[in-house]
Design a protein with these regions (language model features):
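Second-shell loop/turn segments in exported
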Residues: 1-3, 17-25, 110-111, 151-152, ...
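His/Asp/Glu-rich mid-to-C-terminal helical/loop segments that flank catalytic regions of hydrolases
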Residues: 345-386
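N-terminal capping segment at the start of a domain
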Residues: 1-29, 41, 203-207, 276-279, ...
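A non-catalytic alpha/beta surface segment that caps or lines the substrate-entry region
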Residues: 12, 18-127, 148-187
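N-terminal signal-anchor transmembrane helix
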Residues: 1-2, 24-27, 104-134, 207-211, ...
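Metal-dependent peptidase/peptidase-like ectodomains
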Residues: 152-154, 233, 245-345, 349
Length: 386
């Protein structure tokens, strides 16, 4: 049974796996296709158009990385001769990085201006009979490719982080009076971090990725869930939200939250998000981000309990720094949003954001397990049990 469901899910995802960067012809095509499928499920469908300009934000991030590269190289150079100044430079670097990497209302303001890129959020809704609760099932519909493959991006990010740590250690060793013979440490670490930051700053995006794992598999999973959840209690409003421009710093999620702010305040809302769901491997729950911040403690508890009862192995992970998912702006508005993903380090994961991210990388059995677990978690949410 699970295998049959999995085959159907992969086939559904395959029809949605084509290059569809925001604003492209593929983007318009997937918006039309998802609208038609939601209508076929008997939902009231709205296509909420919006436009945005990403260039100013990209310039800020690029120049911040380049400035940070220069600063960390300088700090590394000073680590042996002037460790105090080296440490001060690292403090400045960490503060600047923290300001940009930490989500905040002022940062969201950078994304609210209209611009040349036009896309849409696709929303399917089954209204509640009266005031009650709102359940949101969410997945982003856009895809993108990047000039650096995932292993290279991971390597550059790790190189930047470890390089900064290396500069701090080098300066600390000198301050402790044990720097003899280790003058190379700070310089080497600074150069490694600087080169890594320059590589990240030079990275560009394109429209070559079919987005199989990221995120056609998740679209198919949400459509399957919407079909299964036809019989919810009359006081539960079901919202299926396919966001645009997630790959462009979650602009679509922010626009939807802004547009529906008043109604979100009037009714308790919770969200299950699906991103990268369908890659072969264990089911993954993205539960935390930043410094100890939980995305959805109540939804997490319900889902973990359901997984335990079903015997479904899961792995809970923390969202890596500088990585964005639609759950972040939801959490910052006080809306619990638990993200389902899956996978392990392998071909399917390494192909994300490249032309190799095809539907053939999806694993039907994994997708079926995610659907079953999410459905069980929804029923626990409906019953109000942890």
């Amino acid at each position: 049974m699970t295998h049959d469901v999995g085959e159907r899910l992969v086939a559904s995802a395959a029809t949605l796996a084509f290059p569809r960067r925001s604003g492209s012809e593929g983007d318009r095509r997937v918006i039309e296709e998802l609208s038609a499928r939601l209508e076929g499920l008997g939902l009231h469908v709205a296509v909420e158009d919006f436009s945005y300009e990403l260039a100013p934000v990209e310039r800020i991030l690029r120049w911040t990385l380049l400035g940070g590269a220069g600063l960390v190289v300088w700090a590394g150079w000073l680590a042996h001769s002037s460790p105090i100044w080296s440490g001060a430079a690292i403090v400045v670097l960490v503060l600047c990085g923290g300001i940009l990497l930490g989500w905040s209302p002022w940062l969201e303001g950078l994304y609210r201006r209209s611009g040349p890129t036009r896309t849409a959020n696709v929303v399917g809704k089954r209204e509640a009979a009266g005031p009650g609760r709102r359940l949101i099932l969410m997945a982003h519909h856009d895809s993108k490719s990047q000039s650096l493959a995932l292993p290279a991006r991971m390597g550059a990010t790790l190189g930047a982080l470890l390089g900064v740590v290396g500069v701090v250690v080098g300066a600390g060793v000198v301050l402790a009076g044990r720097g003899d013979g280790l003058s190379w440490m700070g310089v080497t670490a600074g150069v490694v971090a600087g080169v890594s930051m320059v590589a990240l700053a030079a990275m560009s995006s394109g429209n070559d990725s079919p987005g199989g794992v990221d995120n056609a598999g998740s679209l198919a999973i949400v459509l399957e869930l919407a079909a299964r959840l036809r019989e919810l209690p009359p006081d539960v409003e079901l919202v299926v939200l396919f966001t645009g421009a997630e790959e462009d710093h979650m602009v679509g999620a922010m626009r939807w939250l802004d547009l529906h702010a008043e109604e979100l305040e009037s009714v308790t809302s919770d969200c299950f998000n699906f991103d990268g769901a369908g890659s072969p491997g264990r089911v993954v729950l993205i539960t935390r981000y930043g410094i100890g911040r939980a995305f959805a403690p109540d939804l997490e508890r319900m889902t973990v309990t359901a997984a335990r009862e079903m015997g479904t192995p899961i792995r809970r992970i923390v969202m890596a720094p500088a990585v964005g998912i639609d759950a972040i702006p939801f959490a910052h508005r006080g809306i619990e949003c638990l993200s389902f993903s899956s996978g392990s380090l392998g071909q399917a994961t390494y192909a994300v954001h490249s032309a190799g991210d095809v539907a053939g990388n999806l694993d039907g059995d994994t997708m079926a397990r995610i659907v079953d677990l999410a459905e069980a978690a929804v029923h626990r949410w409906v019953a109000g049990s942890g």
